[in-house]
Amino acid sequence: MEINIREDAFIVEINILKCHGTGNDFILIDEYNNNYNLDDETRRDIAIQACNRAKFIGGDGILFVQKSDICDAKMRIFNADGSEAEMCGNGLRCVGRYVIEMLNKESVEIETLKSKYWVKLQEDIYEGVKTVKIDIKSVSLDVKTLPLNYKKEKLIFDKIPELSDEFDFTAVSITNPHLIAIVNNIDSDKLVEIGKKGNSTKSVLPQGVNVSFVKVIDSSNIYVKTYERGVGLTKSCGTAMTASSIVSCIGEKVQFDNAINVYNDGGAIKTIVHKDSNGNYSVDFIGNATFIFEGTMELDKRKIEQFTIDESKFEKETNSYNEFFEYTRKNCK
């Protein structure tokens, strides 16, 4: 990727990469190799504009790839509403693949806002579908890490009256906050209602929260739907799928140390949840990192003037993921 500044118009031309992890789609901007001199206000404005599906490219967020003093690279993610997220599992898979190919390595360590993660190449989850694994170890059930104002140190299968009297939630932090409820049937309207409450009831959740409903299909398959903080109802949220896997193991719906197929509206991933002798959780998080198209975006004083896209380079892997998606629909019922 490279930057081209047209002196006559003060327009900065930025190359972009559209990518997705299980349908959770992003625009990737490479600040590692290019000094764009973007400040956070500009990053926020880019996210709000570029993620608008009606007017621009559309997406759930912007992935900024930067240099790191402690890892191979750093990921920052700004949601579609302009807020910055601490972590995004689906986005991290895309950034991980990008940095792996950029540095010609088999694995890389990526710094995020509050932690760091190893990302490793894996055998394709489906023919032609590029796949990586993230080692997720930054897991906490302490309500202070969300933060959540609750009477006990942990919230495990209990109600939060301010949000709902119907569902039993478990609180999990994977550097970003999650409330997980295991349900018999996923009601999207109720999920949205609770998700909105969870992000507006600051007395309970001062920094908001991601809310997920989990339907257990059988002892090795679950289906997850998520209301994502800063996004809304989403096809996929990587850390929500990770948190849902942990909660499903705690509830003895699936087993620790066994592969779990986690389905959602965007496709499927695999997880393996581990619990050590000290009660600490870690997760192998395995899924696609699909590149969709390359393009350019012209930026004039934080305002996007126009953009172009070229879908030809990644057409084959996009088609492969579409085949994989149809395959997952047959197996998640």
From Swiss-Prot:
Substrate binds at residues 24, 79, 89-90, 176, 210, 228-229, 238-239. It holds the Pfam family DAP_epimerase. The record marks 178, 228 as: Could be important to modulate the pK values of the two catalytic cysteine residues. SUPFAM superfamilies: Diaminopimelate epimerase-like. Signal peptide: none annotated. Its EC number is 5.1.1.7. It catalyses: (2S,6S)-2,6-diaminopimelate = meso-2,6-diaminopimelate. The keyword Flavoprotein does not apply. One of its GO terms (cellular component) is cytosol. InterPro entries: DAP_epimerase_AS (IPR018510), DAP_epimerase_DapF (IPR001653). It is found in: Cytoplasm. One of its GO terms (molecular function) is diaminopimelate epimerase activity. Homodimer. Belongs to the diaminopimelate epimerase family. Catalyzes the stereoinversion of LL-2,6-diaminopimelate (L,L-DAP) to meso-diaminopimelate (meso-DAP), a precursor of L-lysine and an essential component of the bacterial peptidoglycan. This is Diaminopimelate epimerase. It comes from Clostridium acetobutylicum (strain ATCC 824 / DSM 792 / JCM 1419 / IAM 19013 / LMG 5710 / NBRC 13948 / NRRL B-527 / VKM B-1787 / 2291 / W).
